[in-house]
Amino acid sequence: MKLIILEHYSQASEWAAKYIRNRIIQFNPGPDKYFTLGLPTGSTPLGCYQKLIEYYKNGDLSFQYVKTFNMDEYVGLPRDHPESYHSFMWNNFFKHIDIHPENTHILDGNAADLQAECDAFEEKIQAAGGIELFVGGIGPDGHIAFNEPGSSLVSRTRVKTLAMDTILANARFFDGDLAKVPTMALTVGVGTVMDAKEVMILITGAHKAFALYKAIEEGVNHMWTVSAFQQHPRTVFVCDEDATLELKVKTVKYFKGLMLVHNKLVDPLYSIKEKEIQKSQSAKKPYSD
């Protein structure tokens, strides 16, 4: 397990974006080899998405051979509703990059058979070869996707009733009107995310500090679903200073002492422009008789 500690939200977002960029480029995706990326919604990943868009616009990164799978979607909210996760992903990420729409996968909260929709989502992930890198965020209570306190740590994609705390927290997106807030959602399970080859969790802000403490310094507990990722062989937690406020000083010092090593994951920062130059140079073989 790696814990990446940066001073500010913007730095944490940039580190995460650089990591995604390097992972995609090093994977060397192509028509017969897609990079599969799990993605979250919410305010936490916005900074990361903005940097990824910047990399694409600068010609350093392409999503042409990337398939994405989103974590969750509300039940009963029209797809074009401004607060649907379809709208969120399109407006904040997908429409700004070169990803093909058919390679983006988001659960349909208006499907006639919701559980069949969840089962089909799991099948699509398997058909794509599994998730190479699943990026997630958490709530103050440590929930990932809509796997709220008490969720099974081996759960799969399913229909979930939302906790009142989540409904209250989401009311700000619906004009403060609780009657407008969806009470159910479709969500990947903890087990679904655990099946990914690698997991990166973004945790920023003092209001997430206790959840990070539970994830790092205490044991695995279904009341704090983020703690399950202690048992994943390749977990990267990326946080800002504010999110570490509940951690022991020696814990923070220990992981900061590893930053020289961990920063090698994003330095050097790879670019598809450089790869194209290398390809063209290798294609120009010197004359020999």
From Swiss-Prot:
Region forming the signal peptide: none
Enzyme class, broadest EC rank: hydrolase
Modified residues (Phosphothreonine): T161
Annotated EC: 3.5.99.6
Tissue expression remark: Widely expressed. Detected in brain, liver, kidney, muscle, ovary, testis, spermatids and spermatozoa. In spermatids, located close to the developing acrosome vesicle. In spermatozoa, found close to the acrosomal region.
Pfam families: Glucosamine_iso (PF01182)
One of the GO biological process terms: N-acetylglucosamine metabolic process
Keywords: Carbohydrate metabolism, Cytoplasm, Hydrolase, Isomerase, Phosphoprotein
Identification of the protein by name: Glucosamine-6-phosphate deaminase 1
Source organism: Mus musculus
Upper taxonomic lineage: Eukaryota, Metazoa, Chordata, Craniata, Vertebrata
Gene giving rise to this polypeptide: Gnpda1
